[in-house]
Amino acid sequence: MPLAGLPIGKRSALLLDKENMTKYSISPMSSLYELYLRHPRISTDSRRIEPDSVFFALRGASFDGNRFAADALEKGAAYAVVDDPSLPNTRPDKADRLIVVDDALQTLQTLAREHRRELGLPILAITGSNGKTTTKELVSRVLAEKYEVYATRGNLNNHIGVPLTLLAMTRDVEFGIVEMGASACGEIALLCSIAEPNYGIVTNIGRAHLEGFGGPEGVRRGKGELYDWLARTGGRVFVPANDPVLMSMAAERETLAAECYPTTLADGVEHHLEGDYNRFNVAAAVAVGRYFGVDDERIRYAVGSYRPDNHRSQKIRTGQNTLILDCYNANPSSMQASLVNFRQEPLEGCTRKILILGDMLELGDWSDAEHRHIISLAAEIPDARILLVGPHFAKAYRSLESRPADTTLYPSQEVLAAELRKHPVSQALILVKGSHSIG
């Protein structure tokens, strides 16, 4: 579903008039920003309220934050920004701390943009089908060798997370790095209008969120919205010279300044990332570091000091097996890259390879074909045992005329886990690849 755009001009907040509890006074965004400066911590989850914060009552498909505004104030929030105009009357005991606006989400987004403008610092936006978070982590560590850097925490990369990222930046920050995720056209454009980046990286264009983007060409258009923004605003992009798709996209925008770099920049830079495809992420970090004046020795140190977590490109040796975990997210492009890398991975004392592959989501009409393609790639790995998890892989497998040997289907992660506890494996090199959203 497309995200709502920001309003034209500055939003107005409705502040309850403390002199007369039945009337409201209009307060421009500047007044709300002054209140934010006095209470710079932002909360959106009433279950985890930071003391003296401002709570934004956001709405979702199955929740309404307005219902929890009074609870947030009880738990220590200084104020609550709400978009239910009846709240001051239904909770008069909290009325002096309720800020009524006509859209809490848009107010949050506009407040974040106001703060970004007040800070006036350079911001690098990172998007792409794969590798966003890894690239963000590498780049932030490299730039932190010279600057005070604030980068997106966790997965706060959407229409709520990006404003929260910006509002977490303090005046001592010298460089901001904002990860931008999207599953439909228009979403990157919205995030750019909030964060107003000066620099950008599109890591790659892959087959991710095909359903929301409407197909591969939609992915290209959607991710290209970062290039569009930077072309209009005089920004600069960092483009891997050996990626013909990204080079073509940059060339199509005549006013776009581009810093092109070869992936050979990653040569000789030691790191703890699994997979040859991570050379692109390392090269991007080196290119950005050099552009902003970080010396090569500090770049190598920063990249080498990064150890992935959250099951992203991790190799873990247990007492019985060696695990390659890449199961934060999965789409056809990242799945294919993992399989190509796993095929080349040496056994290093293990006796066989096992693939545990989980369903790829949000593929729409492309789901069956993409799952069949991944099964065929897995079958090309010699003597590998294939464990497929989820209904999409099961449907694709059953539709194959020629099915790979030594393949087992599991309806869920729980069933697979129970089977492995009952019949544990040992001396195996195991690739675990799938989306965290399927468990």
Which residues are covered by each model-predicted region?
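Short SAM/SAH-binding signature in class I
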Residues: 175, 199, 284, 425-433
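N-terminal leader/targeting and accessory segments in enzymes
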Residues: 2, 9-110, 114, 376-394
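Short acidic-hydrophobic, aromatic-tinged amphipathic segments that line or gate anion-handling sites
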Residues: 99-103, 407-416
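A glycine-rich beta-strand to alpha-helix segment
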Residues: 127, 420-439
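Phosphate-binding loop of NTP-binding sites
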Residues: 106-237, 241, 247-253, 289, ...
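Acidic, Mg2+-coordinating active-site environments of NTP-dependent enzymes
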Residues: 52, 86-92, 201-322, 344-351, ...
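Active-site beta-alpha connecting loops in nucleotide-dependent enzymes
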Residues: 58-63, 67, 309, 327-405
